[in-house]
Amino acid sequence: MSEIEQTGQSNHYPVMLSESVAGLNIDPNGIYIDCTFGRGGHSRAILNELGEQGRLLAIDQDPEAIRYADANFDDPRFEIQHGSFEALQQYCEARDWVGKIDGILIDLGVSSPQLDEAERGFSFMRSGPLDMRMNPQTGLSAKEWLTQVDEKTLAQVLKQYGEERFSGRIARHIKEAVQEQKLQTTLDLAQVVTKASPKTEKHKHPATRTFQAIRIAVNRELDVLKTVLEVSVAVLKTGGRLSVISFHSLEDRIVKQFIRDQSRIKDLFPDSPIQLEVVEPVIKKVGKPVFPSKEECQENPRSRSAVLRIAERI
């Protein structure tokens, strides 16, 4: 989620705002869920399309996002839920919304306010505590996680979640820095990774992949994504839409694979000589992947890697 909207002293641009909201095919009287409120750019646009009977539930695990919603969204059609979208099923059950949802929007990744606030520990460009938690009130911080993880597992995480070529070398240097108590801030980590990287990529900081990998591990981002995709299909009504914006290939691969798998007829026993059971597709792909316009990329460079995929419950 790299979002920015003109509010107060901050600028936050919601990525592919019109495209993602249009993808929901909004019914003015429908029920919608914004799984990643951030600073409310997408939520505001959805509310603008809803009538008096429409409803919008926004979810965010960041306490700062909840405070922002409480201060800036006074609308009887709107409700903010503090928590992870991994619990989407429970949130819908509590409201008797299972099978009644008209649309779900998921804007993945880190929001611009989280990146810009050094204290959150997401940025390798600003000195801050090694935190990286979407919800700083729960779970292990990045520093705690790096202290506990062994070198082999760390190398696997860097390779799998960061697609880092020099994962083993970087993991070794990180663990050495941890043991020597030289890893206290985000800039400490960035410097360790930079020194450990024998080659650098043009236009990309050497620590980019490592920070991504550690953040994904700390927040269990890919596991949570798989869960929310499965739950989305269960809670959407027939004709309900799912709009998902991803920001790196690992996320997009999961979303693409999920839509493809769930839109195919499945033979549960393909090797059986007798056709025993066939599972019909539960969603269909809507259009082709959508990418930010050239103008949007120029206005908000963080949107450049974004991909929007849309599916419909059948």
From Swiss-Prot:
**What's the EC number here?**
2.1.1.199
Gene3D superfamilies, A to Z: Putative methyltransferase TM0872, insert domain (1.10.150.170), Vaccinia Virus protein VP39 (3.40.50.150)
Report keywords, A-Z.
Cytoplasm, Methyltransferase, rRNA processing, S-adenosyl-L-methionine, Transferase
> Which amino acid positions bind S-adenosyl-L-methionine, per UniProt?
G40, G41, H42, D60, F85, D107, Q114
What Pfam families would the database entry show?
A: Methyltransf_5 (PF01795)
Location in the cell: Cytoplasm
* A biological-process GO annotation: rRNA base methylation
Q: Which residues form a coiled coil?
A: none
CC annotations in GO: cytoplasm
Q: Which reaction does it catalyse?
A: cytidine(1402) in 16S rRNA + S-adenosyl-L-methionine = N(4)-methylcytidine(1402) in 16S rRNA + S-adenosyl-L-homocysteine + H(+)
Q: Which SUPFAM superfamilies match?
A: Putative methyltransferase TM0872, insert domain, S-adenosyl-L-methionine-dependent methyltransferases
- GO molecular function list: rRNA (cytosine-N4-)-methyltransferase activity
Checking InterPro entries in the record gives:
RsmH, SAM-dep_MeTrfase_MraW_recog, SAM-dependent_MTases_sf
* Protein function: Specifically methylates the N4 position of cytidine in position 1402 (C1402) of 16S rRNA.
Q: Which family does it belong to?
A: Belongs to the methyltransferase superfamily. RsmH family.
Checking HAMAP family in the record gives:
16SrRNA_methyltr_H (MF_01007)
Tell me what this protein is called. Answer: Ribosomal RNA small subunit methyltransferase H
Identify the coding gene: rsmH
